[in-house]
Amino acid sequence: MSTTDSIVSSQTKQSSWRKSDTTWTLGLFGTAIGAGVLFFPIRAGFGGLIPILLMLVLAYPIAFYCHRALARLCLSGSNPSGNITETVEEHFGKTGGVVITFLYFFAICPLLWIYGVTITNTFMTFWENQLQMPALNRGVVALFLLLLMAFVIWFGKDLMVKVMSYLVWPFIASLVLISLSLIPYWNSAVIDQVDLSNIALTGHDGILVTVWLGISIMVFSFNFSPIVSSFVVSKREEYEKEFGRDFTERKCSQIISRASMLMVAVVMFFAFSCLFTLSPQNMADAKAQNIPVLSYLANHFASLSGTKSTFATVLEYGASIIALVAIFKSFFGHYLGTLEGLNGLVLKFGYKGDKTKVSMGKLNTISMIFIMGSTWIVAYANPNILDLIEAMGAPIIASLLCLLPMYAIRKAPSLAKYRGRLDNVFVTLIGLLTILNIVYKLF
């Protein structure tokens, strides 16, 4: 083979799309599509048609640029097999490692609290509205559901992980199917409410504030940051030795881009389908009732007068069941991350990092009691889920997903080539706007 043929062959091999790339594209996509998606239509549709159209424009840039920034941070470490904690420690020392451990824990733990509230409300709504049963005590329901999940986690962790992986695709398929099935019920209410002469840009209900608050729920819903570190390590081990780090970075960016496109297409279609079926007032009611949009849809179809179609009856029951399954799936997935993070913190500060001083069983028990206990307290208190996402969940995710990579790009020599780019300004702005939601909630 001539030198030219060798070069052409090498270039073809480099540019080819591998099966593993498709697997990771779907993996990133599947990680993001969870219970958080069930709240996005409520916040997105709350302000009517114009804000959700602006969110549609912002959705892909937020998903792609923010996750690409985190991937670049993970790629910047000298060890191809090093995870994000090792990379941050390499750039900023042991203190950086402690900070990232705290960030990971506090980025995931509030999500468990959110899911604890959600699963309690969804179950009680299904019990009272679809099954027509008498109301139950909230504290007892929350305790029962959490003990049930704790039992499954304690005695069947491996089975739980396997079942979770099987649930991802049926859930995504059900979202697409519901979105399509709602089309016959679309109406023009959301379009009829658009009055260009009375549109307010500022103020409590203005378009800018609505979109600003919507950015938080987008950061929360379009989030696959927990898996980015593992994804980058896998791609570095696959590509870096043969093709170099620059090629690996381009390949990671390409995969993140395709995953973001899939994610935005599915979630935004679902949001628009819900909005055209319901109305901004319905979305406000769903927020006030503190339930996911599928539960509200179930109640909406249950309240239809006259003879209901078979689909309406199926959706009335199916939507709540799908919501429950989605929340269980998301709770289990985030529990594993929370447990790992809390175990690390307890080990680091309680036992000075000495694994010989405590058994893994005892460590898991201590962490489980704290996690389930705190989740039960929050579930019983029943704070508004969207407010909790905007004030706690999304800002912590944004600090990890947006601001940490931007700080690293400014400080770490290995990331110097990414300085001075316009997309850095965009990612920083998204991170700051999301965190500033905390200030907005205070006033």
Curated annotation (Swiss-Prot):
One of its GO terms (molecular function) is symporter activity. The chain crosses the membrane at residues 22-42, 44-64, 97-117, 140-160, 163-183, 207-227, 259-279, 319-339, 366-386, 389-409, 423-443. InterPro entries: Amino_acid_transport_2 (IPR018227), Hydroxy_aa_transpt (IPR004694), Thr/Ser_transpt_TdcC (IPR023726). It is a multi-pass membrane protein. GO terms for cellular component: plasma membrane. It catalyses: L-threonine(in) + H(+)(in) = L-threonine(out) + H(+)(out); L-serine(in) + H(+)(in) = L-serine(out) + H(+)(out). It is found in: Cell inner membrane. Pfam families: Trp_Tyr_perm. Keywords: Amino-acid transport, Cell inner membrane, Cell membrane, Membrane, Symport, Transmembrane, Transmembrane helix, Transport. Belongs to the amino acid/polyamine transporter 2 family. SdaC/TdcC subfamily. Involved in the import of threonine and serine into the cell, with the concomitant import of a proton (symport system). This is Threonine/serine transporter TdcC. The gene is tdcC.
